[in-house]
């Protein structure tokens, strides 16, 4: 079982993409939440025109750009290990069953959900849900939506742990 929030979700996706041919990891499932999947796009450009007019969202996106620059460093941002949305279907088809949660009030929402859809199209069993009232980091910061998400985590992990023990 693998799990990651935000950049950690990106790392989980990268590990699974890298492992698509070798199959050394063999996780029973993966939990990925509100994570960046396309680091080729400037976060400010991801904002809708309405959000681009809102100083709060622009500042958040500018901060996200700083994080992205630190995270990507000298790597090619189009590399699927950096931008999982760019992975080929064969790599995505090797993913285990996934629970993917997006935050309704997060600039990464659209990308996270697009990645979930790519996995579904690759034949992966995916449970994806947008937590409407949630902001980025809601599960770790215990902000609106975190309790519901925690229940989803527990249910998902229990199902897979029981399957592994059967």
Question: Model segments located where?
Answer:
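Alpha/beta-hydrolase superfamily serine-hydrolase fold, recognizing
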Residues: 1-166
């Amino acid at each position: 079982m693998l799990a990651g929030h935000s950049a950690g979700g990106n790392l989980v996706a990268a590990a699974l993409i890298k492992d698509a041919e070798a199959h050394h990891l063999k996780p029973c499932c993966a939990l990925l939440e509100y994570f960046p999947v396309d680091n080729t796009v400037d976060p400010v450009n991801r904002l809708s025109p309405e959000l681009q007019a809102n100083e709060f969202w622009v500042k958040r996106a500018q901060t996200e750009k700083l994080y992205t620059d630190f995270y990507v460093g000298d790597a090619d941002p189009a590399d699927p290990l950096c931008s999982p949305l760019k992975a080929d279907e064969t790599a995505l088809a090797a993913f285990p069953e996934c629970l993917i949660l997006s935050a309704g009030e997060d600039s990464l929402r659209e990308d996270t959900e697009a990645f979930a859809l790519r996995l579904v199209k690759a034949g992966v069993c995916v449970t994806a849900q947008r937590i409407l009232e949630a902001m980025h980091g809601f599960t770790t910061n215990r902000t609106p939506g975190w309790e519901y998400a925690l229940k989803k985590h527990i249910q998902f992990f229990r199902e897979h742990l029981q399957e592994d023990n059967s």
